[in-house]
Amino acid sequence: MSSNKNQSDLNIPTNSASLKQKQRQQLGIKSEIGASTSDVYDPQVASYLSAGDSPSQFANTALHHSNSVSYSASAAAAAAELQHRAELQRRQQQLQQQELQHQQEQLQQYRQAQAQAQAQAQAQAQAQREHQQLQHAYQQQQQLHQLGQLSQQLAQPHLSQHEHVRDALTTDEFDTNEDLRSRYIENEIVKTFNSKAELVHFVKNELGPEERCKIVINSSKPKAVYFQCERSGSFRTTVKDATKRQRIAYTKRNKCAYRLVANLYPNEKDQKRKNKPDEPGHNEENSRISEMWVLRMINPQHNHAPDPINKKKRQKTSRTLVEKPINKPHHHHLLQQEQQQQQQQQQQQQQQQQQQQQQQHNANSQAQQQAAQLQQQMQQQLQASGLPTTPNYSELLGQLGQLSQQQSQQQQLHHIPQQRQRTQSQQSQQQPQQTPHGLDQPDAAVIAAIEASAAAAVASQGSPNVTAAAVAALQHTQGNEHDAQQQQDRGGNNGGAIDSNVDPSLDPNVDPNVQAHDHSHGLRNSYGKRSGFL
């Protein structure tokens, strides 16, 4: 076989087809060798295997013999490498298993935590449901308890008339703070009647004692009758005299809201018979008997305490008008004492007022007498001085007399001369200002002349004159005040024009009376000189 193979290899192809086939075979062998070499990891083994591709067969055999020694070493290295790889794979598998186990443990823990949370939520929801159920049950119990209390409260007024009478006979005491309430509830039908007379009789004689109040008719109509409590404030009465209608019981009416109503409900047969009045069985008596009055409660609540059943009824003849307190002597005595005390106080006040008026009258009369005396003395002094008098001086003396009168009431007469002398000494040191005077005010020169004449008269008589000193001081003070007012008026006018009614020949700084006197003596040009020294 080997010989045949060698022979086939040694055969040289002649044609192109055989050459191509030969190349294809060589290429296939090389590809197989390359694939086998690529599978081996050791480079020495790969180089050894690839050495067979050399073109020379003899070179390949030589290389095979040269590397046979190192083949065992490379095989051992390859085995160690494979073992190392196997160890790495085993470790990698262990790590993967550990990671997978860890993930499974985490997942299990998460599932356990989720299950615990769900259990807690379920427990909380269960607890909430139980709590709500307990609350609902408690509320139902409270509602039942309240309903029981309400039923008891409603059942308490539903007592029979005999029990009311028995309680009233055993004890007459009742709670005055608790308002009366009917045993019938609102809109409840009390009873039905066949006639209006039966209705009124029942309300007056039976329902009133049961309700422990007096029920009266508020208004009566053909198809409705309205009842109310006696204390509601207004109801019909048979007494026509207004003076007799007012009585003590009227003060007890406090607008009670207790109301009843009775309505007339005709039967259906009656309505049909009205349409056919010619029937033989129809008559008015049967229609009256067939009517039905229904008594119904509107407001069962009173605003006052119940009246005792066994109280004494007052006769109608004993009712009197409410005009004055009856049988109250103590109260009348107290009123008389208060009136007497008030009268005494008024009398005392009147006496005090009369005394004060008398004192004032006496003081005024004394002051007027003193003023008259002062005025007479001043007139005598002026006449003795020989100066011309004017009506303005009398007014000035009257004012001075009033001022001296007020000061004489406040101070004693023996202190006045010292004070007046001090004021005169202080005022004499001050220089008087030059101010224009009107027709009603005296000139400062005239006042100075009066003071000088008064001083001369005092010196000639040799006795102190109190009135002269007072007049001089008061005149000087009034002159200063008047000057200040005129200066303010002049400052406000800012030097306005002179009045056209005033004579231009008159000097505004000198008294007109003095100027007229000087004109009569021919002293017209001396005003400017005199005005500078005033």
Curated annotation (Swiss-Prot):
Q: What induces it?
A: Expression is increased in during infection. Expression is also regulated by CDC28, SKO1, and SSK1.
Query: GO cellular component terms?
Result: chromosome, telomeric region; cytoplasm; nucleus
Source domain of life: Eukaryota
What SUPFAM superfamilies does UniProt report for this protein, alphabetically?
beta-sandwich domain of Sec23/24
Q: Where is the composition biased (Basic and acidic residues)?
A: 267-285
BP GO terms, sorted: filamentous growth; filamentous growth of a unicellular organism; positive regulation of DNA-templated transcription; single-species biofilm formation
Q: Does the keyword Transcription regulation apply?
A: yes
Q: One GO molecular function term?
A: DNA-binding transcription factor activity
Where is this gene product found? Answer: Nucleus; Chromosome, Telomere
- Biological role stated in the UniProt entry: Transcriptional activator that binds to the RPG box and to telomeres. Involved in the regulation of the transition between yeast and filamentous forms and plays a role in virulence. Induces expression of HWP1, a major hyphal cell protein and virulence factor.
The text of the family note is: Belongs to the RBF1 family.
What name appears for this protein in its UniProt entry? Transcription factor RBF1
Q: Gene name on record?
A: RBF1
